[in-house]
A protein has these predicted regions:
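Flexible loop/hinge segments that line or gate small-molecule binding clefts
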Residues: 93-107
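Extracellular ectodomain signature
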Residues: 1-24, 30-43, 47-50, 55-74, ...
């Protein structure tokens, strides 16, 4: 939220971008719930007071567009609703390939990367590390089911096999059976997929059941990896914001330190308060150490900005600028202007980082890859071990495997996750009936033949 305020404030001070226009905003928290998201959108469309669909009761200003949501689960129904009214929507989260359909969703754009790019990055990491037998774990919803299948297909195309796709539901007995199956699997690697778990209790339950497995944590889970569940895991994070922007954002936050909204949403969440019981509870829930915050510092987690939000707000502002510039000295009906805005966001192009709003799968993406491990005080620490870069022409993975801290003792070797051991020289693979190609037996080579490479 603070990134939104910072960006709007910066735009309003720029007299060249939107002269004689002041941007404002309404902020609603969807909590990743589609019902809350739709309710919030209808409230904004109706104006203050009771929600009245198809009526706009705001007495001043007009809606330029919507920023959000981060979750595809809530972004999809928002896109369906806003498509009826013709309002521009710019999401700052990962984008389901379904939303790429410009016929169905002409008003939807995103500053986040496409889910398929993340799937490719994970599949190439699995291939690079020589893992051929993995498990995919997701929560039980329609989007996760579709995303899990897409990820499984991508992993298969890169030569590995998926033992099974596990889903966690609201039923504890079902979850126990799923997690017991993970425990018994010969796969050492579990790849998390889709949205994060709904409750902290589910995190701790999963941690207890599969504590010996190595996790691959996608970008969508990055805000939750402080939990001990992710000890010994590999994590993707999108590389964002240069140092100058972080400095500017920090300066902005410190300048409004007396803002009660800022205090409520940030300072009390990460800093010691006068309520010791609350401090103890929050530190236990978030597994994070609080600090005695002064007015000259902020905890790092609170001021590391989301570049996706920053670019989404600027994208909307530049689209509005382009629309107004193309219609100078013309009277434009607000309704017509609203429905034309999406045509101008297609041509928005940022110089500090190449991004094309009109093609969700063409914008270059760069992920940092981290090895997560717990320290003596049980805090999760990260070491950057590599990066993955993706452009329309293809991807590039660079990783230093020697820096990875594995959950198990691997004798300084890369962790193995295979259904079957490599066949030694002199032996060949024999397929098992009904089993995936990664699961096989080894048999002696026929007389007069020999396998000279291990694994053939």
């Amino acid at each position: 939220m603070q990134v939104l305020r910072f960006t709007v404030n910066k735009i309003n001070k720029n007299m060249d971008l939107l002269p004689n226009i002041t941007l404002g905003y309404h902020v609603y928290d969807s909590c990743g719930d589609p019902r809350l998201a739709i309710g919030s959108v209808l409230q904004i469309l109706s104006g203050p007071g009771n929600v009245v669909p198809n009526y706009y009761c705001q007495d001043k200003g007009h809606i330029a567009g919507f920023i959000g949501d981060q979750s595809t689960i809530s972004s999809l129904p928002i896109a369906q609703l806003l498509g009826i009214y013709g309002y521009l929507q710019i999401s700052y989260g990962f984008t389901d390939p379904v939303l790429n359909d410009r016929t169905l969703y002409p008003y939807y754009f995103s500053t986040g990367s496409n889910e398929r790019v993340q799937h490719i990055a994970i599949a190439e990491l699995v291939e690079h590390l020589g893992w051929t037998w993995v498990i995919i774990l997701a929560v039980d919803d329609d989007h996760a089911e579709r995303e899990s299948k897409n990820l499984s297909n991508e992993i298969t195309q890169h030569g590995a096999c998926v033992d099974f796709i596990g889903t966690l539901t609201e039923d504890k007995d079902t979850n126990i059976r799923t997690l017991e199956r993970i425990q018994k699997s010969t796969a050492e690697v579990v790849i998390l997929c889709g949205q994060t778990f709904h409750t902290n209790s589910l995190y701790y339950f999963v941690e207890t059941m599969i504590k010996d497995k190595t996790l691959v944590v996608p970008v969508t889970w990055v805000s939750h990896y402080t939990l001990f569940l992710f000890n010994g895991s590999l994590c993707f994070k999108e590389m964002i914001f240069n140092f100058d922007e972080i400095t500017a954002f920090t300066t902005y936050v410190l300048a409004i330190k007396e803002d009660m909204l800022l205090k409520d949403t940030m300072m009390t969440e990460y800093c010691f308060t006068h309520d010791k019981e609350k401090d103890t509870l929050f530190q236990w829930v978030y597994e994070a150490s609080f600090m005695n915050c002064s007015h000259s510092q902020l905890p790092f987690q609170t001021y590391y900005p989301s570049h996706q939000v920053y670019r989404a707000v600027y994208g909307l502002a530049h689209a509005e600028h382009n629309l107004l510039s193309a219609n100078l000295n013309k009277e434009i009906n607000k309704k017509i202007q609203q429905k034309k805005l999406h045509q101008y966001v297609r041509n928005v192009h940022f110089t500090e980082r190449e991004i094309h709003f009109n093609e969700l799968v063409k914008s270059p993406v760069k992920y940092a890859i981290f090895s997560l491990y717990s320290t003596e005080n049980t805090m999760i620490t990260e070491i950057e071990i590599g990066e993955y870069s993706w452009k329309e022409s293809g991807g590039s993975l660079e990783i230093n495997t020697k820096e990875i801290i594995w959950k198990k003792d691997t004798n300084n070797q890369i962790l193995k996750s295979q259904c079957s051991e490599n066949c030694p020289p002199g032996y060949r693979k024999v397929s098992r009936e009904g089993a995936p190609p990664c699961c096989y037996d080894c048999a002696s080579c026929s007389e007069g033949q020999i396998s000279i490479f291990s694994g053939n």
